[in-house]
């Protein structure tokens, strides 16, 4: 590969500048040779037969990052970020005062034979003489009365607009001398950064839109509470366990997917605003993490099934020898009869007391919580934790909807998939503590109100005078990963008793479905944004 295009263009512009002020320089040979070198490099890369066609100019502008704005700018005539561009009045004054000085500069530029490869141009008379053909082009370029509406020198110009501004034909090939005239404009476009996308500040209407969408999301997330109570009443323990296993795996997939594919990329400043290639590059690392998590989850569960099947005949044989109940689900009765004389009455009474004093199994998803201390203090701790949990969920939703609709949608789905098994476990434990269904519904309404407060706080932190969206996203991603990998995933990997193959496959399906759902939303993020009115 040849030298970078930016270096070639910089060297060419330096050569042209030296040529312009060459009236006071006695020897212009090195400057012309350097200029010819860079011209030859550029025309060798993008030109044809010593000229630069419209297609070659378009490829050059694309390589320089010019010719097309890559996103919304701060305003149609506002300066780019980090640079004080001149105002419209300054531009107009500059153009009114420029011709006399510019003619003196152009007068020093050597337009005689310079080795540029154009025989007709090499025969052009010197500007110090009376050659009207040479002065005609320069005076049209310098003295042309460009209006503010026609000469958009503060906008990102494509190839056709550049040529029209310079009085050149958009379809005719460019000679090296004509291309040298465009060099300062290209350098100015690069320096002013008018073709670089800068994020637009959030207008006041976006605050109302973010508040509305986050409030609706919090109301939608209050549905898991009555759904949990309904499932606890309708489903028995035998059906509740596989359903909770599937929902728990779905929650792990959605929480990890939202953290890795949405929250962390947005917290680091990456946005899926470009083509699909840029989107795939942003999603690649997070998707690979999800793939590794899914593979190891299925591998560990498969090894557990194999180990359990290898140990089951020996365990069953030992239990039959001891006369204990056989918990093998494939056994129809689940019990093994033994003679009455094999055990004395005190032993039978002790086994009966142990069975009565053993605590009841908590629903899956809450195996990590300690339920040894009975009483009202446990219920209040659970309620306090649920209120704080809803407050942080509302905070995450407010920040997500402040960033965009697709980001808020993915966070809403992730929180919903996590809330259903979480509420099932909490309500099952509170029912064991003696709380009624009516009190549980009332407490769920109180925690939902805290979620609304958290959503308003998240919008205020994200769209306030000092935007804290990256910090909120980073904190939310950490919370989601902790809940998924520390609180929920160990419950799926360490069940209280070995799971059948169907349950393991159901959990794998839930994990895969949750990650795929977040990945689909990330891919369709650009298509989801226009579906929301601007407020």
From Swiss-Prot:
Main location: membrane
Catalysed reactions, semicolon-separated: Zn(2+)(in) = Zn(2+)(out)
Signal peptide span: 1-19
Glycosylated sites: 49, 158
Induction notes from the record: Induced in a zinc-responsive manner. During zinc deficiency, the transcript remains associated with polysomes and is rapidly resynthesized and targeted to the basolateral membranes of these cell types after zinc-repletion.
Annotated compartments: Basolateral cell membrane
Cytoplasmic side: 232-242, 307-439, 487-503
Effect of loss of the gene: Homozygous knockout mice lacking Slc39a5 display normal fecondity and seem normal.
UniProt key word Translocase: no
GO MF, one annotated term: zinc ion transmembrane transporter activity
InterPro entries noted in UniProt: ZIP, ZIP_Transporter
Tissues in which the protein is found: Expressed in all stages of eye development and primarily in the sclera and several layers of the retina, including the inner segment, outer plexiform layer and ganglion cell layer. Expressed in pancreas, kidney and the proximal and distal small intestine as well as in the embryonic visceral yolk sac. In the proximal intestine, expression is predominant in the crypts but diminishes toward the apical regions of the villi.
Record PTM Phosphoserine, positions in chain: 333
Membrane topology qualifier: Multi-pass membrane protein
GO CC annotation terms, alphabetical: basolateral plasma membrane; plasma membrane
Transmembrane regions listed in the UniProt entry: 211-231, 243-263, 286-306, 440-460, 466-486, 504-524
PTM notes: N-Glycosylated.
Location of region: Disordered: 316-373
Single GO BP term: zinc ion transport
Alphabetic keyword roster: Cell membrane, Glycoprotein, Ion transport, Membrane, Methylation, Phosphoprotein, Signal, Transmembrane, Transmembrane helix, Transport, Zinc, Zinc transport
Extracellular side: 20-210, 264-285, 461-465, 525-535
Family statement: Belongs to the ZIP transporter (TC 2.A.5) family.
Function comment: Uniporter that transports zinc(2+) into polarized cells of enterocytes, pancreatic acinar and endoderm cells across the basolateral membrane and participates, notably, in zinc excretion from the intestine by the uptake of zinc from the blood into the intestine. The transport mechanism is temperature- and concentration-dependent and saturable. In addition, is also a high affinity copper transporter in vitro. Also may regulate glucose-stimulated insulin secretion (GSIS) in islets primarily through the zinc-activated SIRT1-PPARGC1A axis.
Subunit structure: Homodimer.
Identification of the protein by name: Zinc transporter ZIP5
Source organism: Mus musculus
């Amino acid at each position: 590969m040849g030298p970078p295009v930016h270096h070639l263009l910089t060297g060419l512009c330096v050569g042209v500048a030296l040529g312009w002020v060459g009236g006071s320089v006695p020897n212009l040979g090195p400057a012309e040779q350097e200029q010819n070198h860079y011209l030859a490099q550029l025309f060798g890369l993008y030109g044809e037969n010593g000229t630069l066609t419209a297609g070659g100019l378009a490829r050059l502008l694309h390589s320089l990052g010019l010719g097309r704005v890559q996103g919304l700018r701060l305003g149609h005539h506002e300066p780019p970020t980090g640079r004080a561009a001149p105002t419209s009045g300054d531009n107009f004054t500059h153009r009114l005062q420029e011709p006399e000085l510019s003619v003196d500069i152009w007068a020093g530029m050597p337009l005689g034979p310079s080795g540029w490869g154009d025989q007709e141009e090499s025969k052009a008379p010197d500007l110090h003489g009376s050659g009207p053909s040479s002065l005609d082009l320069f005076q049209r370029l310098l003295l042309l009365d460009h209006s503010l509406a026609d000469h958009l020198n503060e906008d990102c110009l494509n190839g056709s607009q550049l040529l029209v501004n310079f009085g050149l034909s958009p379809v005719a090939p460019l000679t090296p001398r004509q291309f040298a005239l465009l060099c300062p404009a290209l350098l100015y476009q690069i320096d002013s950064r008018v073709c670089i996308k800068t994020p637009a500040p959030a207008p006041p209407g976006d605050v109302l839109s973010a508040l509305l969408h986050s409030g609706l999301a919090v109301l939608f997330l209050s549905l898991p509470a009555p759904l949990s109570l309904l499932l606890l009443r309708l489903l028995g323990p035998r059906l509740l366990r596989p359903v909770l296993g599937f929902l728990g795996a779905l929650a792990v997939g959605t929480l990890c997917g939202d953290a890795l594919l949405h929250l962390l990329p947005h917290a680091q400043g990456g946005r899926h605003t470009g083509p699909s290639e840029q989107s795939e590059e942003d999603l690649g690392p997070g998707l690979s993490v999800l793939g590794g998590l899914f593979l190891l989850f299925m591998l560990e569960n498969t090894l557990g099934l194999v180990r359990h099947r290898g140990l089951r005949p020996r365990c069953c044989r030992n239990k039959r020898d001891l006369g204990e109940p056989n918990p093998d689900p494939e056994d129809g009765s689940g019990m093994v009869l033994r003679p009455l004389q094999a055990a004395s009455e005190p032993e039978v009474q002790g086994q009966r007391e142990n069975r009565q004093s053993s605590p009841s199994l908590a629903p899956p998803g809450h195996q990590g919580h300690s339920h040894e201390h009975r009483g009202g203090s446990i219920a209040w701790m659970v309620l306090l934790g649920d209120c704080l949990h809803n407050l942080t969920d509302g905070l995450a939703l407010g920040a997500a909807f402040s960033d965009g609709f697709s980001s808020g949608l993915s966070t809403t789905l992730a929180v919903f998939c996590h809330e259903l098994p979480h509420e099932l476990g909490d309500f099952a434990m509170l029912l064991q503590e003696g709380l009624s269904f009516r009190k549980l519904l009332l407490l769920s309404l109180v925690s939902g109100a805290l979620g609304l407060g958290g959503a308003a706080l998240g919008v205020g932190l994200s769209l306030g005078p000092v935007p804290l969206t990256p910090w909120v996203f980073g904190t939310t991603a950490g919370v989601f990963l902790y809940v998924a990998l520390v609180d929920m995933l160990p419950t799926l990997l360490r069940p209280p008793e070995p799971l059948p193959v169907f349950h393991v496959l159901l959990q794998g399906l839930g994990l895969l479905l949750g990650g795929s759902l977040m990945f689909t939303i990330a891919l369709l993020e650009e298509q989801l944004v226009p579906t929301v009115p601007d407020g």
